[in-house]
Amino acid sequence: MVDAADSKSAGHWSWGFKSPGSHPEAVMNTYNRFPLTLVRGRGCWVWDDQGRRHLDAVAGIATDTLGHSDRALRRSLGRQLRRLQHVSNLYRIPEQDALATWLVQHSCADSVFFCNSGAEANEAAIKLARKHGHLKRGIDRPRILTASASFHGRTLAAVSATGQPRYHQGFEPMVEGFDYFPYNDIHAFESLLERHEANGPAVAAVLLEPLQGEGGVHPGDAGFFQRLRHLCSERNILLILDEVQVGMGRSGRLWGYEQLGIEPDAFTLAKGLGGGHAIGALLVNAKADVFEPGDHASTFGGNPFACTAGLTVAQEIQRRGLLRNVEERGQQLQQGIQGLVARYPQLLQGVRGWGLLQGLVLHQDCGVTAPQLAKAAIEQRLLLVAAGATVLRMVPPLVISANEVRQLLRRLDATLAELV
């Protein structure tokens, strides 16, 4: 099922775009790419180099908060480029101050460190946790507890924190000091904590996602997180949340921790913060703020351009009432997927998620994997992304309309019908 509009070009764009002298093999082979070249976007839609229009439920993997080529971002970033693009953090940066102020005014944090990505934000959090362990708990070799099936990034400490052995293979030895327990399992956590601390303080921090995205779209359990918060507070262990994927409104709340009824000591952001532009952040409360000048730094982090993008996204979320849209469209999407689960019980097991981060769960023995389903959906001009072998993730821009959700569901229905 492909709309006629999907085959029409728009405006005066040259659909035969090709970079002069370009050689795809010049790009290092680190991605399993789909056979699709995207050259233009507007809102929730992207066009390929053949002029075909696709509904984008990937959004740069939960990154294009306001959709593609957003007017507010175009205007603010155009002005910023004409004024000042980058200066060193050796000097005060007004745009950085403005974004940090907005973030602390709208969260439980008291201060912000800016960087360029989620992995960098988590690396900063890991350094913060270790220093806290040394200074506040007197630990010589601090440990950090994270969850099985978690995902915290590809840099070495971040991937060591990631509780998925497949990401470790070939890159050993991992950074020491990380231990894993089953997500949402408070008894397993308490057992691991007691084992480590039987002879005194040993754990500096717990690092968790409020909702595990890459690991299969598993929402956090509020009861688990509330008990965890209590245990961490009792021992002065930092509770750090990786909000890289759910932060900035994707869950239907501004922050994922609001879904859980807790406040962390620190949390990390990236992805949706810049609306498609590279920015990451570590946000901390006063208790956790142990960094001093020279402890950590970033050349590009907090530059005027990136912070203008972040502040524009934040202000547009407020101005357009996007949290309400996420909640309403998320309910519409989840209910629609439930209907598809009932229609294709031989393929589909269920759906789980928050807001506009929904995971369609396939039966393990259905003969189709999530990556295969994502590839098949391209034929219906629908872009989706897998979260493991059996979960198909839908993370469209937060501006998606009710009609676009209906189109997403129709295209997904048509894809499934072809596979039965």
Swiss-Prot record:
Alphabetical list of Gene3D superfamilies matching this protein: Aspartate Aminotransferase, domain 1, Type I PLP-dependent aspartate aminotransferase-like (Major domain)
SUPFAM superfamilies named among the record's database cross-references: PLP-dependent transferases
Amino-acid biosynthesis listed as a keyword: yes
Annotated residues for binding of N(2)-acetyl-L-ornithine: R154, S298
Binding site for pyridoxal 5'-phosphate: G118, A119, F151, D242, E243, V244, Q245, T299
UniProt keyword list: Amino-acid biosynthesis, Aminotransferase, Arginine biosynthesis, Cytoplasm, Pyridoxal phosphate, Transferase
Main location: cytoplasm
Cofactor(s) recorded in Swiss-Prot or TrEMBL: pyridoxal 5'-phosphate
Subcellular location: Cytoplasm
Single annotated GO MF: pyridoxal phosphate binding
Pathway where this protein functions: Amino-acid biosynthesis; L-arginine biosynthesis; N(2)-acetyl-L-ornithine from L-glutamate: step 4/4
Keyword presence, Amino-acid biosynthesis: yes
Catalytic activity reported: N(2)-acetyl-L-ornithine + 2-oxoglutarate = N-acetyl-L-glutamate 5-semialdehyde + L-glutamate
Cofactor-binding details, from the entry: Binds 1 pyridoxal phosphate per subunit.
PROSITE patterns attached to this UniProt entry: AA_TRANSFER_CLASS_3
CC per GO annotation: cytoplasm
InterPro entries in the record: AcOrn/SuccOrn_fam (IPR004636), Aminotrans_3 (IPR005814), Aminotrans_3_PPA_site (IPR049704), Class-III_PLP-dep_AT (IPR050103), PyrdxlP-dep_Trfase (IPR015424), PyrdxlP-dep_Trfase_major (IPR015421), PyrdxlP-dep_Trfase_small (IPR015422)
Family, per entry: Belongs to the class-III pyridoxal-phosphate-dependent aminotransferase family. ArgD subfamily.
General remark: May also have succinyldiaminopimelate aminotransferase activity, thus carrying out the corresponding step in lysine biosynthesis.
Subunit: Homodimer.
Name the UniProt record assigns to this protein: Acetylornithine aminotransferase
Species in which this protein is naturally found: Parasynechococcus marenigrum (strain WH8102)
